[in-house]
Amino acid sequence: MSERINIPFTNEHFVAFCEKMLGQPYWYGSVVYKCTENLRARKAKQYPAHYGSSRTARYRDDIAKKKVCADCVGLIKGYNWTNGGQGVIESIGTDRTFSSKYGAHGCPDKSANGMFSYAKSKGCAWGTMDTLPEVPGIALRFDGHVGVYIGGGYAVEERGFNYGCVKTKVSSRKWTHWYQLPFVDYGNAVFTGGGATKPDTPASEYTLGTRTLKKGSKGADVKALQEFLLQLG
């Protein structure tokens, strides 16, 4: 685990990112964005019901504190669109920015319900909550909402405007299903339910020095080491 937690797109790295987002605000329609006045104005035009005048002061406080916002499914999409949360946490409370690429890492722009349907269409395992596997990084959902299971009976979720990104006890919420996310690498985790097949998950990219290489290891870091050794002659 200590090795995988440093590798973007593994379930351990994804969970660590979600936990570091605790305390950040919920902005409807946002996908891990820096809180700015320009963003607030744009979202207010898109979703006026969620950006009424009674909420403006809170939104502007988030902006002043240079926070990072998302909605429930936006937390999941944003992790992928920012290349595994690259630069996101470091930007909180500072003037730093980070890059986000729409649809990156094979993560489509889906709603909370749409993401569940998409995962099932990709052959991901899923089931009702009475079959919840002890696999951190899987999604939890009920109609119109999604969160991330972090293990030990707890989840991280962008719960809503009045809550922001919070850690909640799974048993205290009304989750109906769990499901495997097709763009997260769950390693050797065993799933049952649904298609119960391992989807075509993008391979985790390792950079040289982030893991111990062994005979049979594959990846970009192996190629980098081979090239380095060739240069040495």
Describe each model-derived feature in a short phrase.
Residues 1-90, 143-145, 156-158, 188, ...:
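N-terminal capping segments
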Residues 2-15, 62-66, 70, 77, ...:
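...with weaker cross-activation on analogous glycine-rich loops/strands in unrelated enzymes
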Residues 172-203:
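Low-complexity, Gly/Ser/Thr/Pro-rich intrinsically disordered linker/tail segments
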